[in-house]
Amino acid sequence: PLGRDYVKKQPFADQSKAALERLVLGKVVRLSYGGRRVDRHGRALAHLHLKDGTWVQGWLLEQGLARVYSFRDNRTRVAAMLALEEDARRRKEGLWGHRYYSILDAARSHKLVDTFQLVRARIKDAVRIKGRVYLNFGADWRKDFTVTISPKNLRLFGKAGLRPETWQGHEILVRGWINWRNGPMIDVTHPEQIEVL
């Protein structure tokens, strides 16, 4: 998955790959870029379009064959992709019918460190310390799930008119890689990773 040998294959990966191959293999595709063209692993960051106008990423999301994974410096069409993903999730289409892809409760996030997840939880405490925002979801920030936003990334939130440090008590859906730093944590790099519910 993700073109990296050390990442464990996720459930439904083979079905998604087979569907993508049926859709595009042997066909001419047009690439459209919307920011950085290559990621740090050397993969092209492009939207694919078939001759008939089919937007490949949109089709995959609509069929429940993919999740939205966006980048700070390449956010083109992310809003449209999130809407398609949400619709497929609501219908339990494709991978959304698999337990592995269920939206995670913050209390269980420690079990899925080093995986990309969607986590839904209510913010217990929202603070800004030395320019960094911490959204805490439990009584002990040293061991409970936390979302962080660096000063650099916080500027994107400001440009979008968002102030995450004021979200205490709000329920959110956050997406990203869970890492371990004083408990399970997601470092958010851009506003599209968080939806205030």
Please tell me what each predicted stretch does:
Residues 82-84:
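Compact, glycine/acidic-enriched structural inserts
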Residues 1-69, 141-158, 173:
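Electropositive
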Residues 41, 90, 94-197:
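OB-fold single-stranded nucleic acid-binding module
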Residues 63, 87, 91:
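Mid-sequence acidic-hydrophobic segments that form the walls
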Residues 46, 86-87:
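Alpha-helix boundary/capping detector
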